A protein has these predicted regions:
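Repetitive beta-architecture junctions, highlighting loop-to-beta-strand starts
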Residues: 7, 59-63, 98, 111-113, ...
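Signature of short aromatic-glycine-proline-rich micro-motifs recurring in repeat-based ectodomains
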Residues: 22-24, 85-90, 102, 147-163, ...
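Aromatic- and glycine-enriched pocket-lining scaffold segments that form the walls
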Residues: 1-41, 64
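Surface-exposed loop and turn segments in beta-propeller and other repeat-based domains
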Residues: 8-20, 73-84, 127-153, 194-210
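Short loop/turn segments immediately following beta-strands, especially the blade-tip
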Residues: 3-6, 65-71, 116-131, 182-194
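Structural core positions within WD40/WD-like beta-propeller blades
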Residues: 35, 99-101, 171
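Short, conserved, GDST-rich strand-edge loop motifs in beta-rich repeat architectures
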Residues: 37-58, 102-116
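Short coil/turn segments that connect the beta-strands within blades of beta-propeller domains
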Residues: 30-32, 96-98, 166-168
Length: 210
């Protein structure tokens, strides 16, 4: 897009690499990189989540690293097919830092929610590892939707994450269990849970806190 006229000049991606889905993206201008995440293809969300695709690991589970100016995908990291819907990308606000976080909505093997820390290592390669795992909440199967009755638990469903401007706290929205959790991420590789607030959740019969 032209920054003066807002006319569309064309697509950004000159070389997508492995990318075939898209969701969120953030960039770091001084370091000339961009990070993007994945959700799903239009048929996978236009009429709601497709249970078979969710169980089959067909939603997004990769994060992509780009050369910002060259508009080229330079590296892709697969978080694992079980980590479905790798959505929100949250980099450190300090532009001299080369790390950030990505939230995964659900682990389709156990209904956990997860947050990954990603970073650039000393060799210039991007890495990622799971640094937060949030357990599902046990529940009477009669109170659960059909797709998760067999688990006997409410999925966490990490639908959003946000990093405080001082890069100290990460806030994790656990939509399924109805919690907002706060983590001290002063050490981004070892987050520490410091607080949480209950706001409702599946099977709680509580109004959605919009």
């Amino acid at each position: 897009m032209d920054c003066e006229t807002f006319e569309i000049n064309g697509i950004y991606e000159l070389d997508r690499g492995e990318q075939d889905k898209h969701y969120d993206f953030w960039w770091n201008l001084p370091q000339d990189y961009m990070v993007s995440s994945e959700w799903g293809l239009p048929p996978q969300f236009e009429n709601g989540v497709v249970p078979g695709d969710l169980v089959g690991g067909k939603y997004g589970h990769k994060i992509h690293f780009w050369d910002l100016r060259a508009r080229k995908n330079i590296q892709t990291i697969d978080l694992g097919e079980n980590y479905q819907m790798a959505l929100e990308i949250r980099p450190a606000h300090d532009p001299t830092k080369s790390y950030g976080f990505c939230g995964a909505v659900a682990d389709n093997t156990n209904l956990q929610g997860a947050v990954f820390t990603w970073w650039r290592d000393d060799d210039g390669k991007w890495q990622a590892k799971k640094t937060i795992a949030i357990d599902p909440r046990p529940e009477d199967p009669d109170n659960l939707p059909e797709i998760i009755k067999g688990f006997g638990a409410v999925p966490v469903l990490v639908t959003d994450i946000d990093l405080s401007l001082d890069d100290k706290y990460l806030y994790v929205a656990c939509w399924g269990i109805g919690e907002m959790q706060q983590y001290d991420v002063s050490d981004p590789f070892n987050p520490v849970l410091t607080g949480k607030v209950q706001l409702g959740g599946i099977a709680k019969e509580t109004k959605h806190p919009n």
